[in-house]
């Protein structure tokens, strides 16, 4: 009888399951992909929708359009917005995830038993009434440059680039800014990986304060093997050699870190080595997550104190008055991806770099740090990445061939840019939601030509 039941199980359940799995495999989907797909899709959907609605203040229709551009698969999910609780539920075939908003620190996925975010507080200071960059006032607009920039933004969007903000700073003053309909100088824009460049600066501030050295190794007690030889500088250069891939297919390390684990740092600390540290560059949001973990550990005794300290002693002197820096469920500031700010505030990051680490009368990092941050890394495969900043010419193939060799930038998904041209005392900010590659070299070369 038991043997017959086993045969029936095989015939009616196992065999069809194997056939379905084989059919998906023919289409290129592995069992690991299929197993993780519902969790990853609903996690991404809930997180994006929550932040779009309650951080960026988009309506449901705009959020739905942006989510579809990010991935058409996410448009297949069902979304429920609870405006009273500021929570979003995303569901797919019976599988659902929720993300919740919290005052001052935005949205993140909910995980049972993880309440660390509820202990965090981002101190809200009274806005400084002063001219940019100390405050928010702009009275230095050049009418000619303003018209040129507005024309460029309109042309971008005629071409389908979905540019939402362009801003130009020349010699320390905002001389032009243009916004797409529905966006203003007070709109918050997600910088995606531009947050990585800010993480690099936070490490620099800790070095200036004597709280770390970039040559340090033995960084975390969980690393009692070959990983103990990884240095802070290798994390900054993304040459740490950890077995992490910036691939967002379900089952890969990137979505697992961001959308399937409550503590991004704990997940990264569990990964083994793949390469010898310092030898090979591999783009890694995980490296930046570990840097943020280190920042909070070296800043204060707990996450709540660290977040308040960074708000008071890093972002406030920088002059970033309208921003949201999201954390994961374990209370870690997600410096790999999730910092929202106005175009004027993003420009302050570029101006800080242009000023050699000083802004608004306060030194944030040393001038030596800025110089080292903009040096090519020593990897054997890709050297145009400094301390979380992209460099124009570290190889024979410039990133922006029409611009000087010493140009550098913060870059983010959907073609976000804060680009600095030191030779012309220029900072250029581009923010949007591009579905494909943006014409940044063409536009930035044109903008630079206006100031020659």
Regions found by a protein language model. Give the residues of each.
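Structured C-terminal helix/loop/strand segments within mature extracytoplasmic catalytic/sensor domains
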Residues: 29-42, 55, 63, 410-452
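Beta-lactamase-like hydrolase cores
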Residues: 130-171
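Short, charged, amphipathic alpha-helices and their helix-cap/turn boundaries
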Residues: 144, 149-155, 173-178, 251-277, ...
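Active-site SXXK
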Residues: 172, 189-215, 235, 291-295, ...
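Active-site-proximal alpha-helical segments within enzyme catalytic domains
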Residues: 200, 287-296, 335-359, 416-432
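Active-site helix/loop module of the DD-peptidase/beta-lactamase fold
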Residues: 208-242, 270-273, 300-337, 341
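Conserved catalytic neighborhood of penicillin-recognizing serine enzymes
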Residues: 223-252, 257-279, 286-289, 341-344
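Active-site Gly/Thr loop motif
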Residues: 320-324, 371-427
